[in-house]
């Protein structure tokens, strides 16, 4: 496992994200370690070009690889940064912010993380809409649809109505 991760690091330094993706996607998902999924997500994040139609798909793939490992990587700088990065470039600054703040907590003073936090706060207070209203609405509806079952379960389980803040945080 360490050999493949070392090789991925080398490819990353050489900007060979496709090699990382090919190598790690060749390993069945159930055999990949959380670290491998994190490296694969990093490669998808780095390949996501905002000027290409595949951008959102790449970022969503990265999130799908990272999300299952939330408990495992809870206090990991890279995992939190990668989650924030994916959400940020999916124009979900509200969601991105909490991951960048956690990353900064783990690595205080990190300039890249501080820069993203500022950009998130600016995006939240002064949103710049690069897409038309219809596209933004469709994207948010798609995001909501993906999360609806999880949200409904949270509401159903919240018999004493104490998880409101948690529900709101999930939708930011």
Predicted regions: what they are:
Residues 29-30, 72, 106:
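Structural marker of alpha-solenoid helical repeat scaffolds
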């Amino acid at each position: 496992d360490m050999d493949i991760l070392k090789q991925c690091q080398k490819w990353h330094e050489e900007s060979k994200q496709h090699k990382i993706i090919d190598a790690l996607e060749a390993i069945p998902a159930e055999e990949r370690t959380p670290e491998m999924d994190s490296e694969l997500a990093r490669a998808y994040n780095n390949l996501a070009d905002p000027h290409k139609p595949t951008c959102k798909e790449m970022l969503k793939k990265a999130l799908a690889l990272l999300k299952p490992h939330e408990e495992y990587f809870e206090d990991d700088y890279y995992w939190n940064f990668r989650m924030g990065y994916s959400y940020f470039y999916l124009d979900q600054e509200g969601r991105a912010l909490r991951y960048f703040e956690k990353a900064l907590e783990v690595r205080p003073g990190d300039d890249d993380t501080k820069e993203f936090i500022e950009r998130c706060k600016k995006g939240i207070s002064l949103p710049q809409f690069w897409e038309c209203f219809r596209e933004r609405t469709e994207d948010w509806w798609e995001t909501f649809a993906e999360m609806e079952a999880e949200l409904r379960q949270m509401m159903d389980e919240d018999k004493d109505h104490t998880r409101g803040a948690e529900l709101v945080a999930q939708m930011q």
